[in-house]
Amino acid sequence: MATVTQELDPAAAHVLTSAFPAFVKNVGTNFPVPALAYDATTDEAAFWSFIATSYGAGNVTVRVYWYADTATTGNVVWEAQLAAITPNSDSQDIETKAFATLNFVQDTHLGTTGQRLHSADITVSNLDSIAAGDHVTLRLARDANSTSATDDMAGDAYVVKVVVTYSDS
């Protein structure tokens, strides 16, 4: 039993025409930090697509690597949804495919440093009948209006990497 890993970069994200995180490149002291800037007051979402290479069974884990722009306290809520299509089998229109019900995690800022890197794991159990070889679209959103849980961290939350993992058996 092995774990399959899909790494998703901020620059590869796709967005709709509204309610999306801005792509930013923060110029650090020693290297640039590309990120998606999720707003604190408006729900925003970004999308990535990948092939479910060697998917076996079980839940999918979405690990969000993020940091706060300025805040040193508070909670941020991340939501993940999947939409899976089996090529040459499903008759679903790829442009109108619906997402499975979302899963979420509430992560607490660990304090003291505004731009401290955090990671939060979302266990995705609503899998949209994912199978090996499926074309999968991931929706990652910040729940700024606290529909799923309380998101009270002030300012932007910057996503620097998303890692999707699942079992091959």
Locate each region found by the language model:
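Short beta-strands within extracellular/lumenal beta-sheet-rich domains
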Residues: D39-A57
